[in-house]
């Protein structure tokens, strides 16, 4: 029956394409879809949209949407501890559930496939021969391309750049590599993902120089993910306040087909705080005549997708310098070691330089020393930027700048010009440095420590609020996303924050649950389509509701069911199912 349906669908697509060719419309077929959608993408004049819709056999036509990567909100502290926070260390260490024989499709900006953290996997689901067999029997986007071109390694049996139409998936930014590390890095003591033994289908939908991704490429990736038998899909991309116009019905059907194929679809909820954030009220609260908080992003708003909110990590592993015996942790914005504070290494005097305006350096000897600067201030009637402070410090002869916050709060990132090493510390540490009798600090690349603060284990303030515009409860569940340490291109490691980091925790968790259900529940003969539903129900039923600093539960519109708890999901004796 399936082959007959596939044949009929192909004939219908051919009939419509022939109708286009006979028309006066200037239409070029770009991609065909056959698993999540019976259709194709075309390049055509906008003025022909209605005529395309009225073509016999066409159910719908719409202008494709543009999705942005859900960018990290701050690149603050180097972190560990997110996997233990969701019980991943217990299910891996005590039960042996590490995502064996599972595969996760990562629809993102690509991957550094040569990174040491993606070198090995135990009990892989797919070999190159398996991928070749699927390609021979399914119409993948790669067409007649040799499978050896998309098979990168045992860990990465399939990788393709849908945006640039080539096999180079490493040309994008660091976003996709960081996301993949959270799902399933396996680099021993440096970084271990939630499912270290899962395989990756790397589906690059962001062009090397593009700021976002288009439906054309996302649909191709989803279509292939279904054909390739993904157990879970991660999509850390979206648009705020998700709801679309003509595309809504069709895209809803697409995501429903992904779900009906037994694949868990995990999407970032978004980093847009709430609808009234920085709005007309002036206090980040909604007006009485417009009480809507919801700004959770699409595609996480579709009912078939799981919308994932972000919690701040439990522990942060951060670089620090010494003020006497006091450890002062900091955030270094520089990506290259040569531009980081640790490039100085040794004992350095520092000078209090106020807010870092040019006038603040007058009469002060900072040559060969570090400038200590307070955040904020003005110069010539305009706010002082971090880059201006850095420039003034360099011009005065400083070898580095330490900028401290002017308000209490978590460490944030700052934009710098790379003129001299610049790091950011919190307000209390900056004030301690100002009042210290001995204004000398010790710097070393070996100074790495573990810290927690008042924000650890709390919901990330940036994590987008629900509900959706049609009042669905979104997000559904929470995972660590604030200050997550993971893989970066070039064999490096570093931290990012955002729901983009929370969603892959869930995709990795789904791979772990897939192994658990396959090994422990096979006697029940659960169909693949129902395995995903059982996995979702177990994780939702055992999630831990989170409380704020006052001991009050966060709203489900902020955290969904709560923090995923893998160790509870694989040991619970009961669960809820809707």
Language model regions located:
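Inhibitory N-terminal propeptides of secreted protease zymogens
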Residues: 1-71
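N-terminal domain-start motif of subtilase-like serine proteases
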Residues: 29-32, 41-51, 70-123, 160-175, ...
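Subtilisin-like serine protease catalytic core
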Residues: 92-214, 228-231, 259-260, 275-277, ...
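Structured lumen-facing ectodomains of secretory-pathway proteins
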Residues: 116-126, 135-148, 167, 264-265, ...
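Hydrolase catalytic cores
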Residues: 180-183, 201-207, 231, 376, ...
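Short acidic, glycine-rich surface-loop motifs adjacent to enzyme active sites
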Residues: 222-245, 268-269, 368-377
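C-terminal subdomain of the subtilisin-like protease fold in secreted/lumenal serine endopeptidases
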Residues: 234, 307, 412, 418-436, ...
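Catalytic-core regions built around general acid/base machinery
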Residues: 247-265
